[in-house]
Amino acid sequence: MRVLAMGEVDTSYCPIWGYCEAEPSLDATLVVARDMHATTYGETGLRRIIRLYLPRNLQDMLEYDFILINQPVVQYFPPNSLQDIYLAVAEGGRGALCFMESQYSDIYGPWLETQLYDCFPYDHSKNLKLGAPGDKPFDLEIVRDANLPPLMTPYVPLGIENIKPFGEARPTFERPGATIFARCRTNAFSGAGVTNFPLFISWRYGPGNALVWVTADQFDTSMWRTNDGKERYALDIFTGFIWLSSGWELPDDPIRVHMMRDSFTHLRSRIGLVGNIIEFADSFGANTRQVQTKLGGLQLMDKEAGDLYLDHEFDLAESKMGEAFDLASEIEAESVALKERALTWVYLVEWLTVTSTAALSGVAIWSLMVKRRMFHPVSATRRVGD
């Protein structure tokens, strides 16, 4: 499934690209449309990215299965592209997810004037009445409702609600007719009488009957980035949004699927690491042809395992992943050996260079300063005219 993500989606701080790399069913296109966390694209750079990567017409927009909007600078978008996004959702039935409750009026103001805002099941005006507050820590409360798809409930026995704080959110309020999957509990806004508000909201929208989502926690907090090392099943939840919006059923054994996604994440990380080591060794003249061939085979095994996973052939996929991990270990050992041999020659050449330079310097000093072989006494002279 193709995912179009726009706004604050730079890979230096946003995990969306990593999610789509780890999950075999997802393929992402990023449209960075706001500078954040020390990025320095500038208006010219952002407009160029939008021009290059945002679909130029409705037909191209409909090539995507899911659209994610995370606080872009709406003013930088061509007006027709915003209308195309709206039509892709409202009439084309494409799923979508947004976080737009910025603290800055130049972000949320133009957004609220678009028709696209109407697609999403939250009431931004209630957030503004609180003064458009920033992120605050919250504890998670999952809605138990047998009529809802099991997006998060399978992780309750595993202690997902015991992670405190679960993330950092901004007060978000559902529109009438919306469905709430999880809630935030926090006393950070108790002065305004708000101690409980939705975390994930959804509804069906438009003639296309699109399943559309809102999150109260933007994509650079601990909930999504898991930067404290605690398992929040963020990849599983994110993938669940997209699968449900695309008409896919959630897995019957979500814990097994979670473990497989972890395996894909680790394997692809190792493939990237090995590739970097091989490239490093190659830059020093090492013969990397054989190990590169094996790396190509490893990448093929990763793809085959992904295809089996998508066909729900989990036993075969796990078996293929086991073979892939064995091959990855073999390639890692060979590539490290190549690197060490290449560096041995580098160190040897450096040692010989330093040693020869020191030897030549020593000979020169001995000759000039000790033996004084180049020394000649000054001859006596006489003055002209004597």
Residue ranges and their predicted role:
Residues 98-186:
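An acidic, glycine-rich "communication" segment
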Residues 60-109, 207-209:
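Short alpha-beta junction capping motif
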Residues 250-301:
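Amphipathic, heptad-repeat alpha-helical segments
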Residues 64, 94-95, 168-249:
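A glycine-centered loop/beta-turn motif at secondary-structure junctions
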Residues 360-386:
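Juxtamembrane interface at the cytosolic side of transmembrane helices
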Residues 337-356:
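Juxtamembrane/start-of-transmembrane alpha-helix segments at the extracytoplasmic/lumenal side
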